[in-house]
Regions:
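C-terminal motif of bacterial Sec signal peptides marking the signal peptidase cleavage site
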Residues: 6-9
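...with weaker cross-activation on analogous glycine-rich loops/strands in unrelated enzymes
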Residues: 230-300
């Protein structure tokens, strides 16, 4: 389903390639954890002034590699991105806990934004906020509310209309499409990606953002595809190497809806190829992308 096209032009600069971080005080190569907040900020170095590298959503299982000064933790997301988080942003777990979590009935937030409450009523106190794509464990149903367990073990209540059982949701997104799948399944998957992308229109640009709260260009593509059951790598230059290339040398006729369209500089004898921006193709010469905010523009 993933395809790539390179279009020459100018766009917001793509996130820089990760650079080595300072030597941590304590290695912890076998650690595991869950992202504990609705969206956790992952920084390139262990301090608040460091560049924001990416984000991870609540319930994301991560590897723990190192600790620095007892306050910052170096983690790795399932797509392989390594960066630093405040220790309060994650919950340490062991392999047994991770296995139990995988086997449990889980719920995914399917509303743009919600709140987890300490009682099943609208005027209850907030325990945490939640965003589209957050994953929690199912405990039970209480009227118009669903009781869930957050990654830190706290029980909370969320409007049932704001969550969906994870497995049925993944199945509904046509996440795995065999090579011999009917064309109708492929078209349905493309349509779901476009529907998801359009719901982000107006969401502000946020460097390194990967949630409905704010996205950068590659974070937008990554999040839209994630919300349809696909895992992309983090940066546009990495995404460009995913999937199959599409020839646009003679126009846009080979592009299909939901293809990724990349902007940048072709390689020359003096300079290497450089990817600076990514968008999702809507069809009819239009793209949707994050530039100042998520918007629709024409390439024609």
């Amino acid at each position: 389903l993933l395809c790539a096209a390179l279009i020459l032009g100018c766009a917001a600069p793509e996130k820089k390639t990760q650079e080595p971080t300072p030597q941590p005080e304590r290695e912890d190569e076998n650690g595991l954890a869950f992202a504990a907040l609705s969206v956790i900020n992952m920084r390139e170095d262990p301090n608040y002034a460091a560049e924001l590298g990416t984000q991870a959503l609540m319930g994301t299982p991560v590897k723990v590699h190192a600790h620095d000064n007892g306050y910052w933790v170096n983690i790795e997301t399932p797509d392989g991105y390594k960066a630093w988080v405040n220790e309060m942003a994650i919950v340490p777990i062991d392999q047994a806990r991770l296995d139990a979590w995988k086997a449990s009935k889980r719920m995914v937030v399917t509303n743009y934004y919600t709140f987890f409450l300490d009682a099943p009523r609208p005027d209850a106190n907030h325990v945490s906020d939640g965003v589209w794509g957050d994953i929690v464990e199912y405990v039970g149903a209480t009227g118009k509310y669903t009781e869930v367990a957050l990654p830190d073990g706290k029980h909370a209540f969320v409007p049932t209309a704001d969550v969906t059982e994870l497995r049925s949701w993944v199945d509904s997104r046509k996440a795995v499409i065999p090579a011999n799948a009917p064309q109708s399944d492929v078209e349905k998957a493309r349509q779901l990606i476009l529907e998801t992308a359009k719901t982000f229109v107006g969401v502000p640009y946020l460097w390194a953002g990967t949630s409905i709260k704010g996205v950068d260009c590659s974070g937008f593509a990554k999040t839209v595809y994630f919300l349809n059951g696909y895992m992309l790598l983090r940066n546009a230059s990495q995404q460009f190497k995913t999937g199959e290339p599409v020839d646009v040398s003679e126009g846009l006729g080979n592009l299909q809806p939901a293809d990724l369209v990349f902007f940048g500089r072709e390689a020359t004898e003096e300079k290497p190829e450089k990817i600076t921006h990514v968008a999702i193709y809507l069809g009819d010469g239009k793209i949707i992308h994050s530039s100042q905010l998520v918007r629709i523009n024409s390439l024609i």
